[in-house]
Amino acid sequence: MAMSLCPLLLVFVLGLGLTPPSLAQDDSRYRQFLTKHYDANPRGRNDRYCESMMVRRHLTTPCKDTNTFIHGSKSSIKAICGNKNGNPYGETLRISKTRFQVTTCKHAGGSPRPPCRYRATPGFRSIVIACENGLPVHFDESFFRP
């Protein structure tokens, strides 16, 4: 029994070594993007929502000045990276062809240390992102057209 597992284990270990490091890093950046900017089904979109989400997503040490949460499906956000739901925007960014429900949380001022106070701005707009290997990895907060 142990002898029959050795070839399988060898193939598995060799396969791990052949996984491109860039692929693993890209997936990590995508997961980080989701943590910072994705919330499929928000419960309320007010100041309290922003304050709890920013703490829950570890964006308050120090208090992040601005962060936007996208409310939609992961597949529709990923589609911005291709031609299905996205167009080129500037040199390296993509703009969505469709509008997304979003909540933008802005730091209300005061100390950059917790507890952080945020003001919520709910909206419905196009979003601009950066993509790597077909995955969103950065949300452009400077694009704020309704």
Curated annotation (Swiss-Prot):
Has weak tRNA ribonuclease activity by itself due to partial autoinhibition by its C-terminus, which folds into a short alpha-helix that partially occludes the substrate-binding site. In absence of stress, the ribonuclease activity is inhibited by RNH1 in the cytoplasm. In response to stress, dissociates from RNH1 in the cytoplasm and associates with cytoplasmic ribosomes with vacant A-sites: ribosomes directly activate the tRNA ribonuclease activity of ANG by refolding the C-terminal alpha-helix. In response to stress, the angiogenic activity of ANG is inhibited by RNH1 in the nucleus. It is found in: Secreted; Nucleus; Nucleus, Nucleolus; Cytoplasm, Stress granule. The keyword Methyltransferase does not apply. The active site is at H37 (proton acceptor), H138 (proton donor). Its main location: secreted. It is an enzyme of class 3 (hydrolase). Its EC number is 3.1.27.-. Pfam families: RnaseA. GO terms for cellular component: actin cytoskeleton; angiogenin-PRI complex; basement membrane; chromosome; cytoplasmic stress granule; endocytic vesicle; extracellular space; growth cone. Disulfide bonds join C50-C105, C63-C116, C81-C131. A motif (Nucleolar localization signal) lies at residues 55-59. The modification Pyrrolidone carboxylic acid is found at Q25. Belongs to the pancreatic ribonuclease family. PANTHER family: ANGIOGENIN, RIBONUCLEASE. Secreted ribonuclease that can either promote or restrict cell proliferation of target cells, depending on the context. Endocytosed in target cells via its receptor PLXNB2 and translocates to the cytoplasm or nucleus. Under stress conditions, localizes to the cytoplasm and promotes the assembly of stress granules (SGs): specifically cleaves a subset of tRNAs within anticodon loops to produce tRNA-derived stress-induced fragments (tiRNAs), resulting in translation repression and inhibition of cell proliferation. tiRNas also prevent formation of apoptosome, thereby promoting cell survival. This is Angiogenin.
